[in-house]
């Protein structure tokens, strides 16, 4: 049984560049939709996210940009927060891994794993720069590929032949920054023995929600676990307590950021212990939203780290993954010019158009593609032609004919059948949201709009108006507005601005939204919302919900 308290996290965006549509539809829009849905259900929701601010990509790019590390991550942390706001991502708190609470809890995780014999030190050979006086991680190294002989191969992968290897396997390795020759030296690192938790992890993944194809990948991954280094030779990161000049690997510290970010939130609301009711209570339902490339870290490695703790940290109940969103058939890449400027896009097209289309093409079980042609088609045929048309034509007819106050009409059987079908579709939408399917939710939204349009066409109130049958006209308008009320409800998680406009225009007397945060509507998806027997509507002049995309 699902808890009344819901913890939601989404993969921490890496503070190394702007977010693109692929990031949004992969982790942040699905998490936001689920959070909005659960709030509507009356659940106590906490949605935590934040910037992932350590790691080699950050140090290397900051150095190449001539910026300090903190200055560099500050820039992208602000950019990510702004992007979340522009896209209507209703995160309850957006923290960062440079927060005050992060170092202590990361080091505590490490010590607990040590005490349980799950972390042990090991001496290995790593590349060292005499000129720079330090060990260099793979991103700082270039050299000759050991497979194909390409002389500018990266430290972890050859971009010429695609081979992957350890940086120390490169021939003639040199520093990416200075070009200096490198040599091998012994260095000590800590390793997490994941293979010692194999049985615990297999049992754990059997009890959580995973998409079927992801479950197969995770099970196979656990079968082939091996020790994994948790420390690196860097200066930027969380210091390792018992190893000098070492910091934790970003994959080790980043997921702990969900917990430290919740501590950060608790402090911000003046209740420092509030984080415990989400992380130390196993009755909480915890849903995590990620891209598929983060699966192993969230399905296996972070749960393994939690298993090795003295505190009973909450483990994920539903790990909701997305495949990749492509742009016109290719991966989003700013360096290759294959990207869309999000700010410019939102200056031209409404937010709900973008949210709807990204949800409708969400890459839930396979890669999907964003193209402007499909964006245009969906906006014009679905949002304008079906959805907006239904709302506008009903309200325009009602206002034109002075039928703006509607209540308790005498309904015929065909009206009751229409209401019943509308309710069934709304309940279907709830099931789709609960099962993390934005695609199916979008289909159901359009199905309900089409049902409403069909009913209005079939009943043809304009003909009845000419005959002077105003009681019947009002009954039809009442049923159509009731359908629009349900349409607004099931649309809200994906198109919040549009849903609120509909509710404002039909003004159902059963709702008092004045005291609610429009970004966090609470406790509306209830049995009383579906009751039409006492409902009344006060209709306003219609406002076009969507315009055509040229």
From Swiss-Prot:
Pfam family membership, one: tRNA-synt_1g
Record family assignment: Belongs to the class-I aminoacyl-tRNA synthetase family. MetG type 1 subfamily.
Annotated source species: Chlamydia trachomatis serovar A (strain ATCC VR-571B / DSM 19440 / HAR-13)
Cofactor detail note: Binds 1 zinc ion per subunit.
Cofactor: Zn(2+)
Lineage, highest ranks first: Bacteria, Pseudomonadati, Chlamydiota, Chlamydiia, Chlamydiales
Coiled-coil ranges per UniProt: none
Residue numbers covered by motif 'HIGH' region: 13-23
Motif interval(s): 'KMSKS' region: 331-335
Location(s), subcellular: Cytoplasm
Protein name (database record): Methionine--tRNA ligase
Gene3D superfamilies for this protein: HUPs, Isoleucyl-tRNA Synthetase, Domain 1, Methionyl-tRNA synthetase, Zn-domain
Catalytic activity, EC: 6.1.1.10
Gene that encodes it: metG
């Amino acid at each position: 049984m699902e808890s009344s308290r819901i913890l939601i996290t989404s993969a921490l965006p890496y503070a190394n560049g702007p977010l693109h549509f692929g990031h949004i539809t992969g982790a942040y829009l699905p998490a936001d939709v689920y959070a909005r849905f659960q709030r509507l259900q009356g659940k106590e929701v906490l949605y935590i996210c934040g910037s992932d601010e350590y790691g080699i990509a950050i140090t290397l790019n900051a150095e190449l940009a001539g910026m300090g590390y903190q200055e560099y991550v500050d820039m992208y942390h602000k950019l990510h927060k702004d992007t979340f706001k522009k896209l209507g991502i209703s995160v309850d708190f957006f923290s960062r891994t440079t927060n005050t609470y992060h170092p202590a809890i990361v080091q505590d995780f490490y010590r607990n794993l040590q005490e349980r014999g799950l972390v042990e030190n090991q001496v290995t050979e790593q590349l060292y720069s005499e000129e720079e006086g330090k060990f260099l991680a793979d991103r700082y190294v270039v050299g000759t590929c050991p497979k194909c002989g390409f002389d500018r191969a990266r430290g972890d992968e050859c971009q010429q032949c695609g081979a992957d290897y350890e940086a120390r396997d490169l021939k003639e390795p040199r520093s990416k920054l200075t070009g200096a020759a490198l040599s091998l030296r012994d260095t000590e690192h800590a390793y997490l023995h994941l293979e010692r938790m194999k049985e615990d992890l297999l049992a754990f993944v059997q009890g959580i929600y995973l998409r079927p194809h992801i479950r197969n990948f995770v099970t196979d991954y656990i079968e082939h676990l091996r020790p994994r280094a948790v420390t690196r030779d860097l200066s930027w990161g969380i210091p390792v307590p018992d190893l000098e000049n070492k910091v934790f690997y970003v994959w080790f510290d980043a997921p702990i950021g969900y917990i430290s970010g919740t501590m950060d939130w608790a402090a911000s609301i003046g209740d420092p212990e509030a984080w415990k009711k989400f992380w130390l209570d196993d009755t909480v339902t915890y849903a995590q939203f990620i891209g598929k490339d983060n699966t192993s870290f969230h399905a296996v490695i972070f749960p393994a780290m939690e298993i090795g703790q003295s505190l009973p940290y909450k483990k994920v109940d539903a790990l909701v993954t997305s495949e990749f969103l492509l742009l016109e058939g290719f991966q989003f890449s700013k360096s290759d010019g294959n990207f869309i400027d999000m700010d410019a896009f939102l200056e031209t097209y409404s937010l709900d158009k973008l949210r709807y289309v990204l949800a409708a093409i969400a890459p839930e079980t396979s890669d999907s593609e964003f193209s402007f042609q499909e964006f245009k088609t969906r906006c014009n045929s679905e949002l304008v032609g079906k959805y907006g048309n239904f709302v506008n034509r009903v309200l325009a007819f009602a206002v034109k004919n002075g039928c703006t106050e509607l209540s308790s009409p005498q309904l015929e059987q065909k009206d009751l059948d229409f209401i019943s079908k509308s309710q069934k579709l709304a309940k279907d939408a709830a099931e789709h949201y609960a099962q993390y399917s934005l695609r199916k939710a979008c289909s159901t939204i359009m199905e309900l709009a089409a049902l409403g349009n069909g009913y209005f066409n079939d009943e043809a109130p304009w003909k009845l108006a000419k005959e002077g049958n105003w009681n019947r006209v009002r009954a039809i308008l009442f049923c159509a507005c009731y359908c629009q009320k349900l349409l607004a409800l099931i649309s809200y998680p994906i198109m919040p601005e549009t849903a609120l406009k509909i509710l404002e225009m039909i003004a159902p007397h059963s709702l008092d939204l004045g005291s609610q945060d429009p970004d966090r509507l609470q406790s509306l998806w209830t049995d009383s919302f579906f009751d039409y027997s006492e409902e009344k509507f006060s209709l306003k002049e219609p406002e076009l919900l969507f315009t055509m995309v040229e």
